[in-house]
Amino acid sequence: ELMGIVVKPGSAHGVENLNIEERVAKIIDAGCDMLGGETLPDIIVELVKSGKISEERINISIKRILKEKFKLGLFDNPYLKTENISILGNEKFMEKGRESQRRSLVLLKNENNILPLKEGSKVYLQGFNKDETKKFANVSTSLKDAEAIILKLNTPYESNSEYLIEKFFHQGRLDFPEKKKAELLKLIKTKPTITVINLERPAVFPEINEKSKAVIGDFCSQDNIILDLIFGKFKPTGKLPFELPSSMEAVLNQKEDLPYDSKDPLYSFGFGLTYEE
């Protein structure tokens, strides 16, 4: 007997020629228990009434679903003991989360050991929380007066929405559009720049990397955690969980089912620096 529940992904995927009733009947006949991303009880009721799907078949799926819900305790007493509130968001757990963020940060480049910066340095910000940065440095609104730039970037993506799933995820090209790249390079060339890039996907940024004095790979860490690293409150220990490609050409030419095979990656899988003593 099947253990668990069979759930289908969203969209028609190859049966776009069938109407909605035919699709649902085909899905259920294939052994599916839940329609992922859909709420179609009226369609299922009509299929049973018309005899296209038997009530016995529906009961099999209902049994599987309810069994898992009972296992999870979803039908038990929904009221928690008030003393259990102390478990949620307690300081010990919060510190575990902060430590995970610290350990995830990857120092990719540190030219002439520019990092860590000295506290009280004059910095120009782009993408960072100003109030958090003021705890470490003098934040300048003028590039001319700044000693360094601290720049935060996100991995590029394309805003395609032809398919439903694309609306929920960043996808498409991994390199910066030429206009945006030119703007960033113009900024970076004015002062020594510490570039922090959020690597939700493996970004392609060789020119920005070359012109930056320091580069940090970030995985959605809080600004104060990143600033702790920049100003030497802890040493970086993170390693890249994937390689960073050197070009979009390398991305397009690599094999989709073979890891770490892009040509001349900018940074290899597992790369990561730390501060010198």
What is each model feature region?
Residues 2-20, 41-55, 67, 95-277:
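C-terminal non-catalytic regions of proteins with extracellular/luminal or membrane-system context
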Residues 23, 28-35, 41:
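Mobile "lid/hinge" segments at catalytic clefts and subdomain interfaces of large enzymes
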Residues 26, 47, 86-90, 169:
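A short, mixed-charge helix-start or loop-turn motif at secondary-structure junctions
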Residues 28, 49, 70:
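Short polybasic/polar patches that bind polyanions
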Residues 53-70, 75-81:
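Terminal amphipathic helices with adjacent charged low-complexity linkers/tails
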Residues 59, 63, 91-98:
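An alpha-helix initiation/capping motif
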Residues 74-96:
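Long, charged amphipathic helices and adjacent flexible linkers at domain junctions
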